[in-house]
UniProtKB/Swiss-Prot annotation:
Keyword Nucleotidyltransferase recorded: no
Chain's role: Catalyzes the CTP-dependent phosphorylation of riboflavin (vitamin B2) to form flavin mononucleotide (FMN).
Residues annotated as transmembrane: none
Annotated spans, Riboflavin kinase: 90-221
Molecular function as annotated in GO: metal ion binding; nucleotide binding; riboflavin kinase activity
Entry binding sites for CDP: G99, L100, G101, E102, G103, K104, K197, Y198, L199, R200
Recorded superkingdom: Archaea
Cofactor comment text: Binds 1 Mg(2+) ion per subunit.
Organism annotation: Picrophilus torridus (strain ATCC 700027 / DSM 9790 / JCM 10055 / NBRC 100828 / KAW 2/3)
Protein name: Riboflavin kinase
InterPro entries per UniProt: RibK_CTP-dep, Riboflavin_kinase_CTP-dep, Riboflavin_kinase_dom_sf, WH-like_DNA-bd_sf, WH_DNA-bd_sf
Binding site for FMN: S185, E192
One GO term of the biological process aspect: riboflavin biosynthetic process
EC numbers, comma separated: 2.7.1.161
C-alpha cells in the first residue's frame, strides 16, 4: 500500500491541477527510484483499484487520477494534519441553490431521524440547505468528505433500502449544523447541510447568496 500511495503522490505532483499527465512506466520508475518493472506493476494495480484511468494517445500513456485516487491522498493529508496538530477547522464558501426537493423526504424518514437525534443531538428541520462550493474552497470540501465524520447507519423499510450517511459538524453564523454526504457517493461540487433550524428563513437566504460554513474534520466545533 505504501508504494501505491507514493505512486499516487508522484503522479499528482507531475499532473498538477488537471490530474492528468503523459507518463511512461520508465519515467514513473525514475521519479519513485524503483525498477521499471515495479513501476509497471504499480500502474496496473492503480488501474485495477480504480484510482487511475489509463489511455493511449499518439502512442503515449496518459494517466488520469480518478476521484477515488484523490480520496486516498486527501485521507492521508487529513491524518498527517491531525498528527501534526494542524487546525482541524476548515472554511467552506459557496452559493445557495435549490436542491432536487428530496431532502424533506429523506430527513423525515424515521430510520434516519431517530439516529440524527441520538448521534447528532439534533432533531433536524425536514429539509436540507444546498450549497455549491466556490472553486477555491474545493480542496477543503474534499478534505471534509474524506474525514471520518459521524456515521448514520443505512436501513430498510417495506419499500426500499436507504444507504448510510456521514455527518460532519459545522456552524453557519454560529448556528450548529451538519454537512451530510451519502456513504456511496462520488465527489460533487455541491453539498447539503442539515440543522434544527430552517436555515433559509433563519439567515434570510435566497438562491445565489454567498454563505460561509465553518466545518470540522475531527468533530470538535
Amino acid at each position: 500500500m505504501e508504494n501505491i500511495y507514493i505512486a499516487l503522490k508522484t503522479i499528482k505532483k507531475m499532473a498538477g491541477e488537471k490530474n492528468t499527465v503523459f507518463i511512461s512506466s520508465k519515467e514513473l520508475a525514475n521519479e519513485m527510484n524503483v525498477s521499471q518493472q515495479t513501476a509497471s506493476r504499480i500502474i496496473i494495480s492503480l488501474d485495477r483499484l480504480g484510482y487511475i484511468t489509463r489511455t493511449l494517445e499518439n502512442r503515449k500513456q496518459k494517466i488520469t487520477i480518478n476521484d477515488s485516487g484523490l480520496d486516498v491522498l486527501y485521507r492521508e493529508y487529513n491524518e498527517i494534519s491531525s498528527i501534526l496538530r494542524f487546525s482541524q477547522e476548515l472554511k467552506l464558501v459557496g452559493a445557495v441553490q435549490d436542491g432536487l426537493g428530496e431532502g424533506k423526504y429523506y430527513i423525515s424518514k424515521k430510520g434516519y431521524k431517530d439516529q440524527f437525534i441520538a448521534k447528532l443531538g439534533i432533531d433536524p428541520y425536514p429539509g436540507t440547505l444546498n450549497i455549491k462550493i466556490l472553486n477555491e474552497y474545493e480542496n477543503n470540501l474534499r478534505r471534509i468528505k474524506n474525514s471520518d465524520g459521524i456515521y448514520i447507519t443505512g436501513f430498510k423499510d417495506q419499500q426500499r433500502t436507504f444507504g448510510g450517511v456521514f455527518c460532519h459538524a459545522a456552524r453557519i453564523d454560529g448556528i450548529r449544523c451538519f454537512i451530510i454526504f451519502p456513504e456511496r457517493s462520488v465527489y460533487r461540487d455541491t453539498f447539503e447541510v442539515i440543522s434544527e433550524k430552517y436555515l433559509r428563513k433563519e439567515l434570510n437566504l435566497e438562491n445565489g447568496a454567498i454563505i460561509e460554513v465553518l466545518a470540522s474534520i475531527d468533530g470538535k466545533l
